[in-house]
Amino acid sequence: MKFNATARSVQGSSASRRLRRAGRVPAIVYGGTAAPLNIELDHNEIYHALRKEEFHASILNMVIEGGKTEEVLLRSVQWHAYKPQVMHVDFQRVDANQALHTKVPLHFINAEVSPAVKLSGAIISHVLTELDITCLPALLPQFIEVNLGDLLGGGSIHLADIKLPKGVTFNAHGGDTNPLIAAAVVKGGGAADEGDAAAEQPAA
């Protein structure tokens, strides 16, 4: 995905305010061996780009005024407190030979044909909507698919139940290497978990 940028030499709060009044957005590109690059973006262009999922989870081609192109990854966006206005954007340079640490969205499919929904009338709870991963830039997926087609009422799907793309590894947090991804919650019941069996045992 491509977007346009213009290098800027003037920095500081007052300069940033002037840019915003002119319909521009201050931004920065950092990482790699080159020095950080201060840039400005057209507000309307970046606003609409940020509404697209792929802009958040893809290698982006930044075209700097004059024709130079750099591959970057979106890192953070600062929004106005109450207006739909982009205040600042951070991008990171991409090195084809260095692994990326980023987050990618999960796409859930086939929920409507699963036994959980068709037979049990369950509500599918998406416990996670994205995964924290590491991979080389060339292997970065735009999303990871989670097939719910075989999910039963009261059942659940963990990370071990889905197949990660080749070359992609999950970054565990807090020692949880197999987090809960989705659960089929049945009205008046719930999703099955490891504590259910223990709870049903009579007291000694």
Swiss-Prot record:
Gene Ontology annotations for the cellular component aspect, listed alphabetically: cytosolic large ribosomal subunit
Any one GO MF term held by the record is: structural constituent of ribosome
| Keyword annotations of the record | Ribonucleoprotein, Ribosomal protein, RNA-binding, rRNA-binding
InterPro entries (UniProt xref) = Rbsml_bL25/Gln-tRNA_synth_N, Ribosomal_bL25/Gln-tRNA_synth, Ribosomal_bL25_b-dom, Ribosomal_bL25_C, Ribosomal_bL25_long, Ribosomal_bL25_short, Ribosomal_L25_dom, Ribosomal_uL5_bac-type
Provide the GO biological process annotations: translation
Give the similarity note.
Belongs to the bacterial ribosomal protein bL25 family. CTC subfamily.
Q: Whom does it interact with, and what assembly results? A: Part of the 50S ribosomal subunit; part of the 5S rRNA/L5/L18/L25 subcomplex. Contacts the 5S rRNA. Binds to the 5S rRNA independently of L5 and L18.
Known HAMAP family for this protein?
Answer: Ribosomal_bL25 (MF_01336), Ribosomal_bL25_CTC (MF_01334)
Annotated function: This is one of the proteins that binds to the 5S RNA in the ribosome where it forms part of the central protuberance.
Instruction: Report the protein name in the record.
Output: Large ribosomal subunit protein bL25
- List the source organism: Bordetella parapertussis (strain 12822 / ATCC BAA-587 / NCTC 13253)
Ranked from the top, the taxonomy reads: Bacteria, Pseudomonadati, Pseudomonadota, Betaproteobacteria, Burkholderiales
